[in-house]
């Protein structure tokens, strides 16, 4: 149910105390006034700590700097019928016992008068003594239609011809997802006066979004310049992803397609799991948010779950986007769920519920190295659209990986290197280890003040001990599990 319909229902069913979490007080007040005029036909009294009651000329300056008087004022009005009392920042005062007692005393009379108190709050501060009286709502940030409408309004006010940006207006609107209306106004006013091109305009908005997201402390915004051309091999996985590249478009929605949930990538270290996350972001042209699971967990009881919920909210507000959860196996293991105080289990439960039920266009990419220690709930169907295994690259894939890295380091002369021979030498090497061997060869040649050659790479390979040789048991166990048919192969 939408926020508007939810609030309308609460106000029409004698809910005495409604607590609205929001970061846009001005917009919330406007929406409530609009709802009253169009649908509810109630009287509204607005209060803030500095001005007291300010919107009714008969009661100006009542209860200035006195939150208890703000509640007592309701009684002085003799409980008028069908009235809303909109109290700003009242969460700061609601834990006062005098305020709590007065609200409880008034609740029965407010219900009889079909009147309500709406508290506008920037954070959750609900006293336990009022939990049975309060209904909590969350005021969402502006949706696509609201942002689009506001941008057209701002363009008109600033005498900017919106047709100049018409081709990119959809992308412009999407870029501002996760912004408040006030932040959009400040941002677009600054950017439009700079006379930027459409492409640079969107890049600047994404930079501002990056700063906004990183204020959460648990999410990191990745600006990537990758595509599937940077990924060697993994053709099955890339084909699967290509078929979903337009999954968040209007055409897909009109076709009746559901929003994809995401993928779990399991594999040996260095096989390209993190690279794929970055490549999807670039290929699909969607922002990439990386979750720092270590910062989710806190020492205070309940704080970890709250941080996870806040992360989910931020990701959904920034949608469509890609959420990258790297090395999820380090945080959620079967052992942790049994040995810790229950925090891991509760955080995992919060995340799994969201993965199963989410409707917003957030594509989740989770990566793991140790599949055998992952809790079975994470592998259950419905959490992710698909689970892929990334094995050590084949001969053909190693050739492609060598080509990609040599083209990156020597874009004009990469063909002079004997890629086929190098690929045969690097059996059991991961993609990351191949790159490291090339870098090692470059360092050695640079030290000798000359260009590096195929022989330098061969020497580096001969001195390199890949993980497959040092961790044979674990890698063999993972490969045996994958080959058994319990997971889809990425190649």
Curated annotation (Swiss-Prot):
Q: Which PANTHER family match?
A: YCF46 PROTEIN (PTHR42960:SF1)
Q: What is the lineage of its organism?
A: Eukaryota, Rhodophyta, Florideophyceae, Rhodymeniophycidae, Gracilariales
Main site of residence?
plastid
Claim: ATP-binding is one of the keywords in the record: yes
Q: Does the keyword Nucleotide-binding apply?
A: yes
Q: What GO molecular function annotation could you give as one example from this UniProt entry?
A: ATP binding
Organism name: Gracilaria tenuistipitata var. liui
Cross-referenced InterPro entries, in alphabetical order?
Answer: AAA+_ATPase, AAA_domain_protein, AAA_lid_3, ATPase_AAA_core, P-loop_NTPase
- Name of the protein this chain belongs to: Uncharacterized AAA domain-containing protein ycf46
Gene3D superfamilies given for it? 1.10.8.60, P-loop containing nucleotide triphosphate hydrolases
Q: Which GO terms of the cellular component aspect does the record hold?
A: chloroplast
Subcellular location(s) of the protein: Plastid, Chloroplast
Q: Which SMART domains match?
A: AAA (SM00382)
Q: Which UniProt keywords apply?
A: ATP-binding, Chloroplast, Nucleotide-binding, Plastid
Q: Which residues bind ATP?
A: 267-274
Instruction: Name the family the entry cites.
Output: Belongs to the AAA ATPase family. Highly divergent.
């Amino acid at each position: 149910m939408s926020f508007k319909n939810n609030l309308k229902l609460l106000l029409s069913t004698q809910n005495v105390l409604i607590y609205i979490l929001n970061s846009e007080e001005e917009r919330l007040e406007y929406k409530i006034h609009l709802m009253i005029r169009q649908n509810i036909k109630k009287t509204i009294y607005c209060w803030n700590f500095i001005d007291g009651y300010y919107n009714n000329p008969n009661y100006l300056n009542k209860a200035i700097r006195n939150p208890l008087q703000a509640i007592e004022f309701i009684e002085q009005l003799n409980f008028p019928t069908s009235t809303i009392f909109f109290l700003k920042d009242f969460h700061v005062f609601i834990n006062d016992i005098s305020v709590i007692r007065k609200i409880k005393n008034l609740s029965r009379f407010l219900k009889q008068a079909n009147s309500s108190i709406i508290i506008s709050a920037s954070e959750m501060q609900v006293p336990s003594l009022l939990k049975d009286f309060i209904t909590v709502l969350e005021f969402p940030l502006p949706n696509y239609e609201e942002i689009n409408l506001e941008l057209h309004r701002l363009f008109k006010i600033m005498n900017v011809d919106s047709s100049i940006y018409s081709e990119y207006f959809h992308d412009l609107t999407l870029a501002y997802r996760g912004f408040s209306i006030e932040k959009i106004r400040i941002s677009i006013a600054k950017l439009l006066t700079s006379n930027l091109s459409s492409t640079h305009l969107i890049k600047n908005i994404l930079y501002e979004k990056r700063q906004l997201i990183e204020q959460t402390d648990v999410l990191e915004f990745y600006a990537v310049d990758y595509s599937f051309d940077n990924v060697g091999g993994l053709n099955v996985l890339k084909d699967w992803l290509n078929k979903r590249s337009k999954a968040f478009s209007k055409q897909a929605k009109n076709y009746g397609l559901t929003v994809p949930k995401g993928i779990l990538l399991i594999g040996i270290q260095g096989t390209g799991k993190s690279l794929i996350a970055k490549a999807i972001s670039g290929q699909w042209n969607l922002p990439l948010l990386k979750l720092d699971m270590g910062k989710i967990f806190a020492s205070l009881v309940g704080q970890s779950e709250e941080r996870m919920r806040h992360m989910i909210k931020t990701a959904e507000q920034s949608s469509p986007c890609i959420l990258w959860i790297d090395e999820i196996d380090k945080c959620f293991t079967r052992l942790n769920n049994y040995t810790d105080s229950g925090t891991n289990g509760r955080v995992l439960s919060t995340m799994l519920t969201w993965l199963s039920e989410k409707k917003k266009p957030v594509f989740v990419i989770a990566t793991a190295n140790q599949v055998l220690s992952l809790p079975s709930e994470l592998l259950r169907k419905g959490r992710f659209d698909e689970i892929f295994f990334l094995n050590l690259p084949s001969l053909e894939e190693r050739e492609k990986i060598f080509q990609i890295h040599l083209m990156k380091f020597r874009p004009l002369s990469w063909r002079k290197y004997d890629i086929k021979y190098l690929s045969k030498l690097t059996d059991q090497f991961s993609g990351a280890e191949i790159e490291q061997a090339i870098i090692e060869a470059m360092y050695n040649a640079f030290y000798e003040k000359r260009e590096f050659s195929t022989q330098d790479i061969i020497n580096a390979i001969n001195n390199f001990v890949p993980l497959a040789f040092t961790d044979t048991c674990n890698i063999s166990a993972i490969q045996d599990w994958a080959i058994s048919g319990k997971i889809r192969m990425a190649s």
